[in-house]
Amino acid sequence: MRFYSVLLTIVTLIASTYDAKVNASGIQAIAVSSISHDAPAARMLRADHADERGISVPSASKIVEWMLSPKVAKELTFLENRKVQKWVDKQKTQEYVFTKLGLNSGLDKALSNPKLHVYAAYIDRFNVKNPSNKVALLDKFSEKYTDEGVAKMVEMGIRSSNLETENFASRLWRELLNKWMDNAESAEGVFKILKLDEVGGGIFVTPLFNTWYAFIKEGYTRQAEDVVLRVLSDRYGYDGLSRIFFRGQRNFDLVGDLPIKLETRMVNNWLNKDVSPDKVFKLLKLDEGLDKLLTNSNMQVWESYMMKYNLMPDVEPTTMMQTITRFYNFKELSSMLENAKMVPELNKVAERWQHELRVHYLRAPKMKKEG
């Protein structure tokens, strides 16, 4: 009974210090705000401002569940306990224990290694005995497999059906994020560490995007989506970014509705800055050729923007053809639309465009007179 009384006291103290909800992976998309080139100032706000950095801390009931459940932290057997203590007493190095447990045999094998809990226990006990020379669970994994490799392992582990593997991966994930923040890595820097700069338009398809997003969410005082927008638009341009969003919306199970929210924020930024439909047409590079204009996914973004722009107060409403005919002449458009009508998939949209072009052509002289 005394143990439970002490335990309850500990739980109460922890619960009074932190008021948060459990979030195992910490990777969830939320709404966006304005884009900025701000530096990740939150890196300097370590433990004293944990709540501002979005750190998830279990509630009191969850802590009790965690501390009492043998599934959360696998206990050492008698022999494992003796072995760990022997390594610590004899001052065996991380390298020695890492190799001894076979954790240097490849990422896949390391993740499924049944002795992961033994290595974690060794690290914890080593740090207790050497408080001025502490080491991290992450150290040898990063040294052996690189941060990118560890991130891949973490993403696999967090989704594992094995609770021990999931918890070990979560701890590695936390240490990896803290390492980057302690090293003052930028969003661009971690983007390259994870080799996300090599995946092109498939940015929302790779699970490593989640790790990058989680780092930004914890490492920056600004909303994470703002930073994501800035980095991706700087790298891919708005035309490329719009296409990436289109692809990402088909991977809801991996990134949720983040691509939709980012695209919405991008459009709202333009509206807030009163960017004309003509300018957005160019930003999306829709002025660079008629050949694939009808099938260009960026046209959907532009049309949506134009309609929202026309609803704004104190702006002169425009039409789709008013903008398009500033970049392509009537003859070119007519020819393209006639050819498009021959393609079954494009027939309806081509006919709609053709009708709008005729209406615009008939109204153009009147509009010039009024102007």
From Swiss-Prot:
Belongs to the RxLR effector family. GO terms for cellular component: extracellular region; host cell cytoplasm; host cell nucleus. Disulfide bonds: none annotated. This is RxLR effector protein PITG_12731. It comes from Phytophthora infestans (strain T30-4) (Potato late blight agent). It is found in: Secreted; Host nucleus; Host cytoplasm. The RxLR-dEER motif acts to carry the protein into the host cell cytoplasm through binding to cell surface phosphatidylinositol-3-phosphate. A motif (RxLR-dEER) lies at residues 43-53. Keywords: Host cytoplasm, Host nucleus, Secreted, Signal, Virulence. The lineage of its organism: Eukaryota, Sar, Stramenopiles, Oomycota, Peronosporales. Residues 1-24 form the signal peptide. Induction: Expression is induced during host plant infection. Effector that enhances P.infestans colonization of Nicotiana benthamiana leaves.
